[in-house]
Curated annotation (Swiss-Prot):
The gene is rplI. The lineage of its organism: Bacteria, Bacillati, Actinomycetota, Actinomycetes, Kineosporiales. GO terms for biological process: translation. This is Large ribosomal subunit protein bL9. One of its GO terms (molecular function) is rRNA binding. PROSITE patterns: RIBOSOMAL_L9. It comes from Kineococcus radiotolerans (strain ATCC BAA-149 / DSM 14245 / SRS30216).
Amino acid sequence: MKLILTHEVSGLGTPGDVVEVKDGYGRNFLLPRNLATPWTKGGEKQVETISKARKARAIASLDEAKAVKQSLEARTVAFAARAGRGGRLFGAVTPADVALAVSAAGGPTVDKRKVEILQPIKTTGTHKALVRLHPDVSATVTIDVVEATA
């Protein structure tokens, strides 16, 4: 099945890519979640539109991505969450929470889909998260999770 990706799918491609996948994967996973659209003759225009939008949103140059990386790695992001005894959180810190905390701390706006938490953050303390800024540049963000005061 030939599809046009509308969102980034790890291991498959980025928005605007034309991919060939098995029918079941396309019908049961990609299409229902609006991660892709079927390839049509009018798909050429859609690919161009998606790639233009992606370029407008993406960090344009490698130099700019490196500058943002230095900015992110230089700061520690504080995040307050409700916790029980022993510093165990009620829930977990999600990539969306990390993206919001980075923006609130005065950092650049980060897309939650670009934040990768390698180990679930379920306790207070210092943790690390990876932010993919550019295909060649990733920044490691230090997150300091503290107990929220009521």
